């Protein structure tokens, strides 16, 4: 297999037998594969039963490996995606977003639960303090309208990290309007046999 990279300035590296036209063709394969994955999920809805499935589902949407991008998967009670919502993009180590816009988009999707997802171009598959604080703010905002945040996954080019699996996703308590930091189930369902899903 030919491994192909770009230099920091975006120019293709010199690989014997690979000219500019071939380099462009190789890069187009990635875009075609991404489009195929997105269309496949739209035509054949799936239940996202765990963090790994969420990462596989959302990874094709991340189009720029050099900067952070932030998405939200809006789902129904059966954990079937209703919509993939683009939230924001930023610089290689930071992305800023509008909580009010995120809230409006979630409500408009008519979802009952969401999974948050962003990438770390640096390759560090871990949550920063800023990631944790942002997640808590989103849980508070969505909790007030009855939308549950199941997880916040972080993707790198070769790995992923689930905040829920590491006990970093608190629950919203509708009675008090506060966050509960006690341990919660990582994922609410893990059926033995996948259901036939109709959107």
Please identify what each model-predicted range represents.
Residues 55-109, 113:
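Histidine/lysine/aspartate-rich catalytic loop segments that bind and position anionic ligands
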Residues 37-54:
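Long, charged amphipathic helices and adjacent flexible linkers at domain junctions
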Residues 114-120:
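Short beta-strands and strand-loop turn motifs
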Residues 1-15:
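A short amphipathic alpha-helix within small helical-bundle interaction modules
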Residues 122-126:
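Short, solvent-exposed loop/turn segments at secondary-structure junctions
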Residues 136-199:
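Divalent-metal-activated hydrolytic enzyme cores
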């Amino acid at each position: 297999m030919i491994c192909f990279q770009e230099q920091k300035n975006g120019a293709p590296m010199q690989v014997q037998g690979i000219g500019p036209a071939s380099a462009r063709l190789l890069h187009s394969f990635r875009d075609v594969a991404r489009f195929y994955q997105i269309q496949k999920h739209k035509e054949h809805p799936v239940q996202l039963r765990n963090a790994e499935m969420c990462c596989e589902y959302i990874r094709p949407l991340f189009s720029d490996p050099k900067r952070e991008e932030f998405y939200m998967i809006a789902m129904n009670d059966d954990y079937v995606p209703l919509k993939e919502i683009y939230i924001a993009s930023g610089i290689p180590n930071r992305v800023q977003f509008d909580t009010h816009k995120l809230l409006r988009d979630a409500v408009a999707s008519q979802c009952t639960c969401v999974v948050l997802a962003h990438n770390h171009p640096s390759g560090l598959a871990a949550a920063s303090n800023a990631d944790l604080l942002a997640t808590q703010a989103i849980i508070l905002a969505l909790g007030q309208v009855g939308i549950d945040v199941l997880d916040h996954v972080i993707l790198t080019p070769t790995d992923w990290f689930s905040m829920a699996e590491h006990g970093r996703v608190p629950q919203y308590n509708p009675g008090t309007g506060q966050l509960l930091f006690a341990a919660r189930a990582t994922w609410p369902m893990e059926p033995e046999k996948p259901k036939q899903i109709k959107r």
